[in-house]
Amino acid sequence: MPSGPISVARQVCVARIGAPHGVRGAMRLWSFTADPLAVGDYGPLSTKDGTRSFEIATARAAKDHLVVTLKGVTTRDEAVRLNGLELYVPRDALPPTEDDEYYHADLIGLPAITTSGEPLGRVLAIHNFGAGDIIEIAPASGPTLLLPFTNAVVPTVDLAAGQVIIELPAEIEGDTPNHPEA
């Protein structure tokens, strides 16, 4: 199991290790890449803090995950200790995106501006709880905003200018709906 410091700047999470599979060090792996089997093509996979790195020795598809072996991991006990570990690669190791596609890492930290030009906050995270992407905005004060990451709510992502434009929905943060029964 190779280890050594790796730069943590601009790291992108590409996989998460799951439970062991068998007794010879194989494990389940959930890949977050477009082609799950390509997860090892981006170079060594490292921990978030960059102190440990791993190379995929073998990988095969299985239902909704992969079954992989990592170089240097040869026993079930070693695989158990890695369960739940998220694996990262440098952002520049990933292929370029298509128009209207973004890596979450490229959006985190960008200023969020309303369509009227008012500062709203910064992009804190992108979530997906199963019904579509959610953009989390951290305003300068007050609670964070969770908004649907749709073209209607996020009409513009301008990576060159380093900002996202947000069209706030009419009913948000306790606004009273424009209905007579309200």
Curated annotation (Swiss-Prot):
Protein name: Ribosome maturation factor RimM
PRC barrel domain location: 99-176
Originating organism: Rhodopseudomonas palustris (strain HaA2)
InterPro entries: PRC_barrel-like_sf, PRC_RimM, RimM, RimM_N, RimM_N_sf, Transl_B-barrel_sf
Family to which the UniProt record says this protein belongs: Belongs to the RimM family.
Taxonomic lineage from the root: Bacteria, Pseudomonadati, Pseudomonadota, Alphaproteobacteria, Hyphomicrobiales
GO cellular component, one term: ribosome
Chief location bin: cytoplasm
HAMAP family, A to Z: Ribosome_mat_RimM
Domain remarks in the Swiss-Prot or TrEMBL record: The PRC barrel domain binds ribosomal protein uS19.
Record carries keyword rRNA processing: yes
Function: An accessory protein needed during the final step in the assembly of 30S ribosomal subunit, possibly for assembly of the head region. Essential for efficient processing of 16S rRNA. May be needed both before and after RbfA during the maturation of 16S rRNA. It has affinity for free ribosomal 30S subunits but not for 70S ribosomes.
UniProt keyword list: Chaperone, Cytoplasm, Ribosome biogenesis, rRNA processing
